[in-house]
Amino acid sequence: MKKLFFALVIFSPFNLFSQDRITGEMFSTRSEVISQNGMVATSHPLASQIGIDILQNGGNAIDAAIAANAALGLMEPTGNGIGGDLFAIVWIEKEKKLYGLNASGRSPENLTLEYFKENNFKSIPAYGPLPVSVPGCVDGWFELHNKFGKISMADILSPTIKYAEDGFPVSELVSYYMKVAS
């Protein structure tokens, strides 16, 4: 019995490393995730679930992306939100066509290149009100939805509105930034 125990102790560690790894690496890696009917991946599980629910309820990938992005603006306001910009690249397989959207903020209507020249600016200042643009995110959602959306914007945004009204668990990351900011 003592010899058997010794043999198990000696050979067990080698057995851990002797398995073939598809990646070719000798350490654990993340598993591949595959799906037959669509997938949503975000940095927040509730936002991902909202996107999945949109797909399951008849929405398409654009609808799910808008819904997940709206949820991230609520649930992770440190990195997302309606006060930012939106950029999208959309491939429509049936058309074999690629679409792009630049929904970055525009300057206020009266803030023109001529204004900067007349006031002797050689470049746009880094600080103050002049470098601020009008957020383009929400307009981007509606541009994408008008071109590619399948279900109503009310249905797309209602899960996030419900979380905004009823509350949701705050993630560790957001909690940290709230603490630092207070």
Residue ranges with predicted function:
Residues M1-D20:
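Bacterial Sec-dependent N-terminal signal peptides
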